[in-house]
Amino acid sequence: MTLILNPESARVLGCLIEKEITTPEYYPLSLNALINACNQKSNRDPAMSLDEDSVRVALRNLTDKGLARHAPSEGRVPKYEHDVNNAMQLSRREVAILCELLLRGPQTPGELRGRAERMYKFEGIEDVHSTLQRLMERDPALVVVLPRQPGTKEARYTHTLMPVDMQPQPAVEVSHSVSGGNDGRIAQLEAEVRELRAEIETLKEQVKSLTPVN
């Protein structure tokens, strides 16, 4: 059975995994809650605007592949949950990494460590590297390392559930005629800005999860 997903199915799967971990009191998700999760602005790249039909189709796709299902519910409103644990037999740290890759696309180990912290507290960057390595060593692999882009120090990793050319790509940086020292300083500042943005998005999501729903 192929597990290749389209962008909509990848987003739905990532949201189901994320909400189970970060807001378990509201999980499994109703269709409306899942649509809102798919379209939220924080912790998503790219931003999407999925409608009800798109999410229903994505759920059917995931259900056919054994990755999602209707959740048992005593209420009238149907709810949905992922089935990644049974389908893939992943550890908690592996689930956190896969979820972030589904929600944001290719990322560096440093970005993954900061962004996945709301789902799993990694002991350090080495812990992230070892988790990525385990995901790459699976058969078939769930993660691959991408060729390093010009001007970047860290390699990026991505999941294999969706073709790489369908995943979000970082903007290409234009090289200017500046000294080598300035180049290094600019790259350092840009990396710091990226990390700060990731921390801000994480804090936003944590505050949002603490806000009671009326």
Swiss-Prot record:
InterPro entries reported in the protein's UniProt record: DUF480 (IPR007432), WH-like_DNA-bd_sf (IPR036388), WH_DNA-bd_sf (IPR036390)
Chain segments annotated as coiled-coil in the UniProt record: none
Homology family: Belongs to the UPF0502 family.
Family matches, as PANTHER family: UPF0502 PROTEIN YCEH
Annotated protein name in UniProt: UPF0502 protein Acid345_3645
Provenance organism: Koribacter versatilis (strain Ellin345)
